[in-house]
Structures are given as C-alpha cells and as structure tokens.
C-alpha cells in the first residue's frame, strides 16, 4: 500500500489551507492502554496538532484522542505527547527541515494500516495571508470553469 492508504480515521483539512506541504512521511505511533480502541472508534482530532523533534526523537503534540467509554480507571490523558516511530535516516532529514526557517511538521492523516495506527506527517512551510487568498481565488475560478462546462453539457 502506498503512503496514506488504509482505513482513514481522521484528516487534518486545515493543514493544506495553512501550509505548503512539500514532503510526507509515514510514522507509527506509540500508544498506551485504551488509545487504540478510541482511535478505531474514530474519536480523534488532529486540528491543532504538530510534531517536534526533541533529542533525536519525534513527538506529536496536541493530538486529541478521546477517552475510551468503557476504559474506567485505565483511561489515558487525551492530549498527552505521543512518540512517533520513524527510521533514523528520516528523523535526520526532518531535523534538517525543521532547522530551516519557517518549516514545521504537521500531521495530515491518521489511519490504520495492517492493524497498526499510522500518521502521515507533512513537512510544511506556513502560508502568508495573501497566499491563502490566492488559493481561494484559484479554487473559485476553477469552480466557475467547471460550472460553465456543466451548463454547456446540459444544452
């Protein structure tokens, strides 16, 4: 399966709006207790999450996994920092990217592949306000073109 394939659980739609995504990496996640049950139930939010390289390891911050309903006292902290599993070579590349000004690591998708939870991590450069406006204009123009084609097809 190519990167980003598998049963999609959550997607960070805002990431493509806020960042130019240049490269993607597939990473495993170190989970505790009932977290995988909540993930399989789809109770995950990637909205404000980001990844950081700390002491040669990659950690995912602010990813919200809701507590499992039947988990009682074994439940986890919903916003805890989670370690990501990557090859050393990939981590070294990410260190190089994050040292450059303006680059950040953003989770794009969370999915289950072969029974394991995976995160598609994107290396992104923040968009300025005018870049966002330009993207919106381009999308609107594309919609107008498609609408005109559909009107032509009806006649």
UniProtKB/Swiss-Prot annotation:
- Which terms under GO biological process does the entry name? trans-translation
Going by the UniProt record, its keywords in alphabetical order are: Cytoplasm, RNA-binding
Q: Which Pfam families is this protein grouped with? A: SmpB (PF01668)
- Which InterPro entries did the record assign? SmpB, SsrA-bd_prot, SsrA-bd_prot_CS
Q: Which family does the record assign?
A: Belongs to the SmpB family.
Disulfide cross-links: none
Query: What is a single cellular component term in the Gene Ontology annotation?
Result: cytosol
Purpose of the protein: Required for rescue of stalled ribosomes mediated by trans-translation. Binds to transfer-messenger RNA (tmRNA), required for stable association of tmRNA with ribosomes. tmRNA and SmpB together mimic tRNA shape, replacing the anticodon stem-loop with SmpB. tmRNA is encoded by the ssrA gene; the 2 termini fold to resemble tRNA(Ala) and it encodes a 'tag peptide', a short internal open reading frame. During trans-translation Ala-aminoacylated tmRNA acts like a tRNA, entering the A-site of stalled ribosomes, displacing the stalled mRNA.
Q: TM segments?
A: none
Asked if the record carries the keyword Cytoplasm, the reply is yes
Q: Which organism is it from?
A: Geobacillus sp. (strain WCH70)
User: What's one GO MF term for it?
Assistant: RNA binding
Localization terms from the record: Cytoplasm
* Chief localisation class: cytoplasm
Q: By its UniProt entry, which HAMAP family does this protein fall under?
A: SmpB (MF_00023)
Q: Would you tell me the protein name for this molecule?
A: SsrA-binding protein
């Amino acid at each position: 399966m190519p990167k980003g394939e598998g049963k999609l659980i959550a997607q960070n739609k805002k990431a493509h709006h806020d960042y130019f995504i240049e490269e993607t990496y597939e990473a495993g996640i170190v989970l505790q207790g009932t977290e995988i049950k909540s993930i399989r139930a789809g109770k995950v939010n990637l909205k404000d999450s980001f990844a950081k390289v700390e002491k040669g390891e990659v950690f995912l911050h602010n990813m919200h996994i809701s507590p499992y309903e039947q988990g009682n006292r074994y439940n986890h902290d919903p916003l805890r920092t989670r370690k990501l599993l990557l090859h050393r070579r990939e981590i070294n590349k990410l260190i190089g990217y994050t040292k450059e000004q303006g680059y950040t690591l953003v989770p794009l998708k969370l999915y289950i592949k072969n029974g394991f939870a995976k995160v598609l991590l994107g290396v992104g450069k923040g968009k300025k306000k005018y870049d966002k406006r330009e993207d919106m204009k381009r999308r609107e123009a594309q919609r107008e073109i498609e609408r005109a084609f559909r009107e032509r097809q009806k006649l």
